[in-house]
Amino acid sequence: MIRVAINGYGRIGRSVLRALYESGKRGQMQLVAINELAKPEAIVHLTNYDTTHGRFHTRASLDEGMMHLGNDAIRLLAIEDAAALPWQALDVDLVFECTGALNDRQSAEAHITAGARKVLISHPSSADVDATIVYGVNDASLKATDTVVSNASCTTNCLVPVIDVLDRHFGVKSGAITTIHSAMNDQQVIDAYHDDLRRTRAASQSIIPVDTKLARGIERILPQMKDKFEAISVRVPTINVTAIDLSVTLDTRVDIATVNAALKAAADGSASGILGYTDEPLVSCDFNHDPRSSVVDGTQTRVSAGHLVKMLLWCDNEWGFANRMLDTALAMAATQAE
């Protein structure tokens, strides 16, 4: 049983808590504290009620600075300086760093200073972290000495399992990616100021291009893909679920059936629970609360001239990613136990 804490109780932090209670992993992981600079009443309310994922099946209540979930008591903290958090006193093995702010090694190590043994960052990180992990692809590379780890991004987790399968079966020469991403909380409800002029505009009224370093994130997990991919990203007026338009040029000549068969076999076999495959006529909301990292939409696979393949991938950018946070945390703990 590992003792964990969540720092930053926003969309991903709350999804991590819910995923822990829905995934059957509570026998392996105990949540002892949440640090969030918000009123405890608001923390409890947003645990119980969620516009995207519905009401929580376990009723949360507040009593003397503790959030109670069934028989569990979780300490609520509101401490701005991560280095001052009481992780040593609480005997915290691992911190889920979900603020979106402490994304490089130096800032994330504040949790180690505070007494935690390991940190898992819910965001792409600087190159000097001990590891960047896409669970199901490179988690076997984790070592006991890895203390500050990044869980990459939701879109990297969606793409990399698919690219890995395609490369192993057919060889990938190059690729281009467009992420069609749901709106996020760094956008505006109505027009307001932002450093990114496109993000000054109302999220519910426009398709909004944003910068992305997704291609570089792929290279970090699959070094053989260096300089082979480029990516753009647009935000769309939905609150959850992301689609990814993936185009790749393959070494091997293929057809639609061959590509889909390879991906379906992986989804049914070695990548089960991480990669999914569907040939049903589904839309984005059908993938809400889907715990997998990526689902291939086989109905949208296209092949041009035998080598250029276009595909559509789906992911719940909150729920799938939160479930991988749990998987990666347990994988980190397992290296310590070896």
From Swiss-Prot:
Belongs to the glyceraldehyde-3-phosphate dehydrogenase family. Epd subfamily. It is an enzyme of class 1 (oxidoreductase). Substrate binds at S153, C154, T155, R199, T212, K213, R235. GO terms for molecular function: erythrose-4-phosphate dehydrogenase activity; NAD binding. Its EC number is 1.2.1.72. It comes from Shewanella amazonensis (strain ATCC BAA-1098 / SB2B). It is found in: Cytoplasm. The record marks H181 as: Activates thiol group during catalysis. One of its GO terms (cellular component) is cytoplasm. Its main location: cytoplasm. Catalyzes the NAD-dependent conversion of D-erythrose 4-phosphate to 4-phosphoerythronate. The active site is at C154. It catalyses: D-erythrose 4-phosphate + NAD(+) + H2O = 4-phospho-D-erythronate + NADH + 2 H(+). The gene is epd. Pathway: Cofactor biosynthesis; pyridoxine 5'-phosphate biosynthesis; pyridoxine 5'-phosphate from D-erythrose 4-phosphate: step 1/5. This is D-erythrose-4-phosphate dehydrogenase. NAD(+) binds at R11, I12, N317. It comes from the Bacteria. Homotetramer. Gene3D superfamilies: Dihydrodipicolinate Reductase, domain 2, NAD(P)-binding Rossmann-like Domain.
